[in-house]
Design a protein with these regions (language model features):
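Short solvent-exposed coil/turn linkers within tandem alpha-helical repeat scaffolds
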Residues: 107-117, 131, 145-154, 181-190, ...
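N-terminal positive-inside, membrane-proximal cytosolic segments immediately preceding the first
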Residues: 1-38
Length: 250
């Protein structure tokens, strides 16, 4: 074979090699593109499916929580005020709390990741407390108090402080009221926490400390026109109970 022929054959081999390599690259690129596209579709479907599932769970939780609240709001039997025939009633608040607690606990356990599930945890604590089961109530309030939702966390801490007061742990209650008084939660406004703290001091006989807090609230809780707010009015009554008892003499 002469040199010219050899060169032609060599070029042909190079062309075949390049063509083969190009085909392989194209096929590999196409395969990767398809895999990437399929993966993207799977991710999108998973996201849509996950959202749909979450919405379904949320709706279930809302319905279950609503049913538990209906039980909790059931009227108590009052012989002096007969209820219409067929109206469900409970003989006592403790009996009602026990019935509602069963449902709140179930909602909290089954739908704990939803907003209604977290609210159910809080109301489980409330109903445990009404039943006199302080241990489980404390656990529920602590769990609620650790929530990422600041409004819900404030409710949990406020109820926990109340429980501490009822179980002679005033120092722990004071710590929580001071924390809430520095907060911004709409569910437990700072002024409310300050009022609760002042009332605790008053119950301990620490009248001067209570009066200092009432005086701060009285001066601070006013609108832009200087009109006293609800907390200011309560503080004024606490500072001057005689005037509050006989408003006509002012």
């Amino acid at each position: 074979v002469d040199n010219a022929t050899k060169r032609q054959l060599k070029k042909k081999d190079q062309f075949v090699a390049l063509t083969t390599s190009g085909v392989h690259w194209a096929e590999e690129h196409r395969r990767k593109t398809i895999i990437a596209a399929v993966t993207l579709v799977v991710v999108v479907l998973a996201a849509v499916g996950g959202y749909t599932f979450y919405q379904h769970r949320t709706n279930e939780a809302d319905t279950a929580f609503g049913a538990a609240m209906q039980v909790y709001q059931t009227p108590l039997l009052n012989p002096a005020q007969p209820m219409p025939p067929g109206t469900k009633t409970f003989n006592s608040a403790k009996e009602r709390a026990a019935a509602a607690n069963t449902q709140f606990t179930q909602v909290a356990n089954q739908f704990g990741l939803t907003k209604s599930g977290k609210l159910a945890e809080y109301f489980a604590g409330v109903t445990y407390m009404e039943e006199g089961q302080n241990g489980p109530a404390e656990d529920a309030f602590k769990k609620t108090g650790a929530s990422w939702d600041s409004g819900l966390a404030a409710l949990g801490k406020s109820s926990l402080a109340e429980l501490y007061q009822q179980t002679n742990r005033d120092a722990q209650a004071i710590d929580l009221y001071n924390e809430l008084a520095k907060g911004t939660a709409a569910t437990v406004p700072p002024m409310l926490a300050q009022l609760q703290l002042a009332e605790l001091y008053q119950s301990q006989g620490k009248t001067e400390q209570a009066r200092q807090i009432y005086a701060i609230i009285k001066d601070k809780d006013k609108d832009s026109k200087g009109k006293p707010g609800a907390a200011s009015q309560i503080a004024s009554e606490k500072l001057n109970p005689r005037a509050a008892a006989a408003p006509g003499l002012q």
